[in-house]
A protein has these predicted regions:
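Positively charged n-region of N-terminal signal peptides that target proteins for export
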Residues: 1-8, 19
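C-terminal motif of bacterial Sec signal peptides marking the signal peptidase cleavage site
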Residues: 13-16
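N-terminal helix-cap/turn-to-beta initiation motif at the start of protein domains
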Residues: 19-34
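Short, solvent-exposed coil/turn segments at beta-strand boundaries
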Residues: 29, 57-65, 91-95, 112-119, ...
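N-terminal glycine/threonine-rich, aromatic-flanked beta-hairpin/loop signature
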Residues: 46-87
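An anionic, turn-rich surface loop/hairpin at beta-sheet edges
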Residues: 79-112
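Short, compact, well-ordered microdomains
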Residues: 108-129
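Edge beta-strand at a domain terminus
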Residues: 122-147
Length: 147
């Protein structure tokens, strides 16, 4: 009986602590994001150190946009190509999904958490992708802020 009570309490605590993502939170995703780690369904983690590429998201007020891989350069700019994934944001049953499409594939990921500095997605294989907000690099000595 005691174990059942503890289990129910922990379950309640877990459910009540999940972030409720609102439509206005989606605007926070616009910009550059650097992957920090991936958490696999068995709890194993893969940490990422320095990343050669960032994910750039641009979502409009109609919840449509794109995700593109960009490579930060030492002067604060980004190298880009023409490849991108179209994105549609979908709200369903108090959950938020990002539906991706390319000419070759379609898939969805659930948005688990978002803030001004952190972003977490979960894919169909139950892998969680943890991102941190990224800034352009600038190691030049001119003291100027990059755009």
């Amino acid at each position: 009986m005691k174990n059942t009570f503890i289990l129910l309490f922990l379950l309640f605590l877990f459910v009540s602590c999940q972030q409720k993502i609102k439509p206005e939170d989606i605007a926070k995703i616009n910009g550059y994001w650097e992957i920090e780690k991936v958490v696999f369904d068995q709890g194993k983690e893969k940490d990422y150190g320095v990343n050669e590429s960032y994910d750039y998201f641009q979502i409009d007020n109609k919840n449509k946009g794109f995700r593109k891989k960009v490579m930060p350069q030492l002067d604060g700019t980004f190298m880009v190509n023409d490849t991108q994934e179209d994105v549609k944001v979908r709200f369903k049953d108090d959950k938020v999904f990002f539906d991706y499409a390319t000419p070759y594939a379609k898939w969805s990921e659930e948005l688990i958490a978002i803030s001004d500095k952190e972003l977490v997605f979960e894919n169909a294989d139950k892998k969680e992708y943890h991102y941190k907000k990224a800034e352009p690099l600038n190691i030049s000595d001119d003291g100027k802020k990059t755009k």
